[in-house]
Design a protein with these regions (language model features):
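Conserved alpha-helical scaffold segments that buttress catalytic/binding sites
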Residues: 1-115
């Protein structure tokens, strides 16, 4: 018999990080290689103003610094998520020039910030 899939719905998108990190910590989901299915009219893949070491060292501090527009990229940098599937609603008239894209996310060697 297959295991049920847990579903979490949150109003502020970045609040889902608490659930993801808890599930990683309890080994309910893998530490890495996760696929994120994201339903939204915005990609939420902005770059938060955080040092890369914070992302890896202190998830609790990280959660205080991310917001609804930039919560996904730290999970990619940390290696938790390797694919984001963004489901853009057909009724949205924003960001109409979207297309499949590959991004590189890393650390600025001078500032130690996420880029």
């Amino acid at each position: 018999m297959s295991r049920p899939i847990s579903v979490v719905v949150v109003e502020r998108h970045n609040e889902v990080l608490n659930y993801i990190y808890r599930a990683i910590g309890s080994k309910t989901i893998s530490f890495s290689g996760l696929k994120l299915l994201h339903f939204d009219s915005h990609p939420d893949m902005g770059i938060p103003d955080v040092e890369c070491s914070e992302i890896l060292r202190d998830p609790e501090q990280l959660m205080k610094k991310v917001s609804i527009e930039n919560w996904i990229t730290p999970m990619i940098y940390a290696g938790h998520v390797d694919h984001v599937i963004w489901m853009h609603p057909t009724w949205s008239r924003q960001l109409l020039n979207r297309k499949p894209t590959c991004y590189s996310i890393g650390e600025d060697l001078c500032t130690k910030r996420l880029v």
